[in-house]
């Protein structure tokens, strides 16, 4: 069996795991930080360094939230293989069924050492703990007016894995693609140079078992991925942008055909 590819975000992920240790049995990692956990092909392009730690958290049987697209502030390091994206915040998705449950969740966050961010221009959902900045967003758009529709089923279907001696829950690859596609259309505004699209391509390229996993996924998820992949494959802007999300050496550029072939298979699965 080939060794797993190197995960440049492992140190960042471990630091967040330790900070969230009391909640590890109730959280699931999602978003950019999960990319390195989903890439299994050592021949794929290196995973980009994101500085983000994305997790879904359940504080009680009816309350959950996800730390999505989160970023721990670190000094930039320029690896030769891929650029570094250093942001400064962690976005969290809240699976609270009501505003009252959101209030309870906020109290729990204070108990974990987080506090509301009072900086000018900070969104209402922002929390901080040391260098960790957390945007706590709901899965129910009625609570604060925004969400990603795939976070709730992603939490319900999270899988277990181990890292640094800790057992953690991670979003599955099919739901990872769905959440990233939703973000690509939303915050990404269909920008073909976005990090959401980059993460999508990285997982499609680096996970040979993806097509079989989608085949076993719920019908609504299969259809969504099929429709979205079909739309991308018919878009000249996407086809032109694809090589730019791979390394520029000849071997990496040849993997563009692998990505397109795998996406075509996902279209057929729907």
Mark where each language-model region is:
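Compositionally biased terminal segments of proteins
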Residues: 1-270
